[in-house]
């Protein structure tokens, strides 16, 4: 289905240890995490909170298992803090990823975000940016995009539950306000369906701008409970709203077909944060790998 050597398969370490709730998977070590990724048949991963920040140490650990770094999340605060604060941290992050050989930097605006708040209802309290904040966000992303390109990288914007860029309208507004040469899009199946959006619409409309893909499924019954009981994003994760592709309600056939027929080159990263005590990360990594092999031929 996919042209040879165009797509690499990664998996996020958040299934082993959760960055937002470190108590989930606290006993899972870095070495266990990357060893199980390799055993499950993946080519690489994104960066988790247990990963060494010393690139020499990290490269050696990954090379032993034939793994690469696909990218790493970066939180921007362009709507709520001075640009300089985000830029200073971004440059360190950019240089780290450049040294690790990554080609994209995942960015997500966390100004007013409720995704990390345990007791704030997800759908009821979703932030909405003012026009001034939208302008700050777009201008700031252009600045970060230029900084990324100084080292040959691209920023990919991660639309995300509980943030100011979550819905179809918000994604469209951000894409309209930003330069395609400087700001690309991360396509995440799970966050779109969780929000009630139509993922194929976003995929088709912004296909040329999509430079990174997160493969994530959802358990609809948990999402329904989150809405009915006004739960937070973190409570949704703990209750199992997300799972690996093939284990939930999202149909991936057309997603894979559209991407295979496009010029997409880059990573597919399985990112399915859930409680590792309830969903063994190695078992679910194997499940995801088998599904992708069957559906995408990768």
UniProtKB/Swiss-Prot annotation:
Catalytically driven reaction(s): scyllo-inosose = 3D-3,5/4-trihydroxycyclohexane-1,2-dione + H2O
This protein's pathway: Polyol metabolism; myo-inositol degradation into acetyl-CoA; acetyl-CoA from myo-inositol: step 2/7
Broad enzyme group: lyase
A Pfam family the protein falls into: AP_endonuc_2
GO molecular function, one term: manganese ion binding
Keyword set, alphabetical order: Cobalt, Lyase, Manganese
EC number in record: 4.2.1.44
Requisite cofactors: glutathione; Co(2+); Mn(2+)
UniProt keyword Lyase, yes or no: yes
One record GO biological process: inositol catabolic process
Family assignment from sequence similarity: Belongs to the IolE/MocC family.
Name of the protein in question: Inosose dehydratase 1
Organism: Bacillus cereus (strain ZK / E33L)
Gene encoding the protein: iolE1
